[in-house]
Amino acid sequence: MVLIKEFRVVLPCSVQEYQVGQLYSVAEASKNETGGGEGIEVLKNEPYEKDGEKGQYTHKIYHLKSKVPAFVRMIAPEGSLVFHEKAWNAYPYCRTIVTNEYMKDDFFIKIETWHKPDLGTLENVHGLDPNTWKTVEIVHIDIADRSQVEPADYKADEDPALFQSVKTKRGPLGPNWKKELANNPDCPQMCAYKLVTIKFKWWGLQSKVENFIQKQEKRIFTNFHRQLFCWIDKWIDLTMEDIRRMEDETQKELETMRKKGSVRGTSAADV
């Protein structure tokens, strides 16, 4: 058995703008989660071409310990809380696979994302067979809804309900911002359709861990896209060449940060 959910995140930006904004925000967010022996190590970041698909391939290692729940830490052997993330970014389609060498075939997280120029109204954009699609829970994430944010995660300067972009004049996003966006021909719109498939085969813990991971994915998607929108003035003028240069610099920074300082960012204890 696997647990599948589709998260839909609507944003007041275009699919083209989001490509730069996403990569900028991933680099920044990675630095916020790295330090004290934990965090993200980038092994590869290079172009790929396979079976007619072209894009950017990344291979990252996540060194975790405080970022997993206590009931997993208690039974996990030393060194087992290391996860490999391989991603194929053939934008506007992206596929990410997370694995763990200790659990091998008994664990994976697969995140498949389509970025579409709409307001999250398309059904089954990932083309699942009808029987599988019937089992998928659809979760709508509203980046301006503070009630969807964990209290420990809230930051006023990353709140789309308060933020207004100087460069684009977008925001602040009120309670009816999606309806207003639908009726505003001057503002672009898009939706990230993120299909998350989780397998965790460990007797007695399977449903508990699968539900924990899905909850964490929703938390990550919510916080990340709130940041992305509130950082728009920092990335809206960047080119893909700027992004690749920034990624190279971030890779070196992460290696230094991970080896020193204290643990930073999201911890499972906050959940």
From Swiss-Prot:
For the modification N6-acetyllysine, the affected residues are 215
Q: Which residues carry this modification: Phosphoserine?
A: 262
User: What is the protein's given name?
Assistant: Phosphatidylinositol transfer protein beta isoform
Which controlled-vocabulary keywords does the entry list?
Acetylation, Endoplasmic reticulum, Golgi apparatus, Lipid transport, Lipid-binding, Membrane, Phosphoprotein, Transport
**Among the entry's GO cellular component annotations, what is one?**
cytoplasm
**Keyword Acetylation (UniProt):** yes
* CDD domains (alphabetical): SRPBCC_PITPNA-B_like (cd08888)
Q: Which GO terms describe its molecular function?
A: phosphatidylcholine binding; phosphatidylcholine transfer activity; phosphatidylcholine transporter activity; phosphatidylinositol binding; phosphatidylinositol transfer activity; sphingomyelin transfer activity
Please list the reactions this protein catalyses: a 1,2-diacyl-sn-glycero-3-phosphocholine(in) = a 1,2-diacyl-sn-glycero-3-phosphocholine(out); a 1,2-diacyl-sn-glycero-3-phospho-(1D-myo-inositol)(in) = a 1,2-diacyl-sn-glycero-3-phospho-(1D-myo-inositol)(out); an N-(acyl)-sphingosylphosphocholine(in) = an N-(acyl)-sphingosylphosphocholine(out)
- Species source reads Bos taurus (Bovine)
Q: Which Pfam families match?
A: IP_trans (PF02121)
Question: According to its UniProt record, which protein family does this protein belong to?
Answer: Belongs to the PtdIns transfer protein family. PI transfer class I subfamily.
Reported function: Catalyzes the transfer of phosphatidylinositol, phosphatidylcholine and sphingomyelin between membranes. Required for COPI-mediated retrograde transport from the Golgi to the endoplasmic reticulum; phosphatidylinositol and phosphatidylcholine transfer activity is essential for this function.
Domain of life of the organism in this record? Eukaryota
PTM statement from Swiss-Prot or TrEMBL: Constitutive phosphorylation of Ser-262 has no effect on phospholipid transfer activity but is required for Golgi targeting.
Q: Which GO terms describe its biological process?
A: retrograde vesicle-mediated transport, Golgi to endoplasmic reticulum
Where it sits in the cell: the answer is:
Golgi apparatus; Golgi apparatus membrane; Endoplasmic reticulum membrane
Report which residue ranges the record marks as coiled coil. none
